[in-house]
Amino acid sequence: MPTPHEAEKQHTGPEEADRPPSMSSHDAAPSGPPSRNPCCLCWCCCCSCSWNQERQRAWQVSRESKLQPLPSCEVCTPPSPKEVQSWAQSFDKLMHSPTGRSVFRAFLRTEYSEENMLFWLACEELKAEANQHVVDEKARLIYEDYVSILSPKEVSLDSRVREGINRKMQEPSPHTFDDAQLQIYTLMHRDSYPRFLTSPTYRSLLLQGAPQSSEA
């Protein structure tokens, strides 16, 4: 059994030779937390932003590869006076003219009903598609964008047409939305078309094509 003197020696800590050398004032550790390199912070921030932008861009490309967004203007050539006048003859002539559709679409945008034209054009694209895989994907996107009640671009369809679409979506085809397309076409014809003919948009086009009177 160790004597009291030996026990005291055992609890006095390591011998002087075993103790680590004391640090000088130059080697002392800083009292506060280590400072970060501002360049590292800048790089991390830029890297994070860059990654988020790239992820968003990849998602957008993936979506656009399935259903290409329609251009804001189908054509850029100005219509002839005769063509502009023909738009007042019938709604069919307006809708069969790429320029007429573009002008009418711009008018619908001012009435916050552009989704009607967008839906009609999307249905036209679907009917021209032959690849069944693409048909399935486009039909799903058209449904989500224009038929779903959760979509901000939902078009106005009656319950009968909606029920028919829900049944057809089990096996989509290029003609899944034919009834809905006709209903929206009729809505634009009866509701928006008469206002378009009296709008400043259409009247200005008529005036541009009117013959100028010459002064003597």
UniProtKB/Swiss-Prot annotation:
Region feature (Disordered): 1-30
Cellular localization per UniProt: Membrane
Coiled-coil annotated residue ranges, if any: none
Region named Interaction with GIPC: 207-216
This protein's GO CC annotations: membrane
GO biological process, one term: negative regulation of signal transduction
InterPro entries in the cross-refs: RGS, RGS_sf, RGS_subdom1/3, RGS_subdomain_2
Keywords: Lipoprotein, Membrane, Palmitate, Phosphoprotein, Signal transduction inhibitor
Entry membrane topology: Lipid-anchor
Record domain RGS: where: 90-206
S-S pairs: none
UniProt PTM: Fatty acylated. Heavily palmitoylated in the cysteine string motif.
Location of Phosphoserine modifications: 24, 97, 151
Superkingdom: Eukaryota
Keyword presence, rRNA processing: no
Gene3D superfamilies registered for this protein in UniProt: 1.10.196.10, Regulator of G-protein Signalling 4, domain 2 (1.10.167.10)
Residue spans of biased composition, Basic and acidic residues class: 1-19
Role noted for this protein: Inhibits signal transduction by increasing the GTPase activity of G protein alpha subunits thereby driving them into their inactive GDP-bound form. Binds to G-alpha subfamily 1 members, with the order G(i)a3 > G(i)a1 > G(o)a >> G(z)a/G(i)a2. Activity on G(z)-alpha is inhibited by phosphorylation and palmitoylation of the G-protein.
Subunit details: Interacts with GIPC PDZ domain. Interacts with GNAO1.
The name this protein goes by in its record: Regulator of G-protein signaling 19
Gene: Rgs19
